[in-house]
């Protein structure tokens, strides 16, 4: 699996008929690659994967891989809380040309223990055609994969990374336990985009990169050259903006901002709602601009 340190968890654009808008998706992909994104997660949380049908996912993944055309890493969501279905779908998605890896979430609702998690991922890995990236997000699943469990699964050659959402101590522990070339650790928390690099991880799977990929790239470049003054300044600028994109249920804030920028990604599907006028104004305030369209000056500069 190719290396990627700034991965965008990309939204799924919908048109007025609530169908996937592939024209907008192509524009957004090209823009994000130009801004410094070197990877994508498609059809996952930010991409509203739970609202996509099986045929929609297969078509989306196939067309998305064609859009990227080898210019960036492509990780497609294939996980669920049903082991047999996850194994079958992971196998199917792995057969799509241009898909580099699959994202498999820790089973939600069922709430397995650590041994159950190991059994789940072992079964899915046995069916996989492409590398698997674990997705540990306790706030959405109700269970937390422990660092020791991650280390056990990292020994499986088909399991080559993790998107880890949670505390910094857990993130650091996972990095320390999985120090070998075939396993990549990404944070799924935008606010940890800097921390993950200083801890020796690969990078961030980001929502904020839709708007601030260039600034995150600039921060990473400053870190690489030891310019801590610039790193600190960029981190201070980015943190409140990153938090703002989760002030309302995600990805509604990101979609509202992208719509204001001219990327007509539409509304989220139910049960999520688009931001109303008052919420859009509040989001603009949190992003530090008088109205959402005003972010164009810093995002598209």
Curated annotation (Swiss-Prot):
Matches recorded under NCBIfam families: dapA
Enzyme type, top EC level: lyase
Biological process terms in GO annotation: diaminopimelate biosynthetic process; lysine biosynthetic process via diaminopimelate
Main location: cytoplasm
Pathway it works in: Amino-acid biosynthesis; L-lysine biosynthesis via DAP pathway; (S)-tetrahydrodipicolinate from L-aspartate: step 3/4
HAMAP family xref list: DapA
Subunit field text: Homotetramer; dimer of dimers.
Protein name: 4-hydroxy-tetrahydrodipicolinate synthase
Keywords: Amino-acid biosynthesis, Cytoplasm, Diaminopimelate biosynthesis, Lyase, Lysine biosynthesis, Schiff base
A Pfam family that the UniProt record links to this protein: DHDPS
One example GO MF annotation: 4-hydroxy-tetrahydrodipicolinate synthase activity
SUPFAM superfamilies per record: Aldolase (SSF51569)
Role this protein plays: Catalyzes the condensation of (S)-aspartate-beta-semialdehyde [(S)-ASA] and pyruvate to 4-hydroxy-tetrahydrodipicolinate (HTPA).
């Amino acid at each position: 699996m190719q290396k990627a340190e700034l991965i965008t968890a990309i939204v799924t654009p919908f048109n007025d008929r609530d169908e996937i808008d592939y024209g907008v998706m192509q524009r957004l992909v090209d823009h994000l690659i130009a801004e410094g994104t070197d990877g994508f997660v498609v059809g996952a949380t930010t991409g509203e994967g739970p609202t996509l049908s099986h045929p929609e996912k297969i078509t989306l993944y196939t067309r998305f891989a064609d859009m990227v055309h080898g210019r960036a890493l492509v990780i497609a969501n294939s996980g669920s809380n049903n082991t047999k279905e996850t194994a079958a779908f992971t196998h199917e998605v792995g057969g799509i040309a241009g898909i580099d890896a699959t994202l498999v979430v820790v089973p939600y609702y069922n709430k397995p223990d650590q041994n159950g998690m190991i059994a789940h991922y072992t079964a899915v890995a046995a069916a996989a055609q492409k590398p698997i990236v674990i997705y540990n997000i306790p706030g959405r699943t109700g269970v937390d994969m422990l660092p020791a469990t991650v280390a056990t699964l990292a020994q499986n050659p088909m399991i080559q990374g993790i998107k880890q959402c949670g505390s910094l101590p857990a993130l650091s522990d996972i990095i320390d336990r999985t120090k070998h070339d075939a396993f990549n650790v990404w944070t799924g928390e935008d606010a940890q985009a800097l921390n993950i690099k200083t801890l020796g991880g690969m990078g961030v799977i980001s929502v904020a990169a839709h708007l601030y990929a260039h600034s995150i790239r600039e921060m990473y470049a400053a870190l690489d050259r030891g310019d801590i003054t610039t790193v600190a300044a960029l981190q201070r600028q980015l943190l409140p903006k990153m938090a703002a994109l989760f002030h309302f249920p995600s990805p509604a804030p990101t979609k509202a901002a992208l719509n204001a920028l001219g990327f007509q990604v539409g509304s989220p599907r139910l049960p999520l709602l688009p931001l109303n006028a008052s919420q859009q104004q509040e989001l603009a305030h949190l992003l530090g601009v008088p109205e959402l369209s005003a972010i164009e000056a810093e995002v598209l500069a």
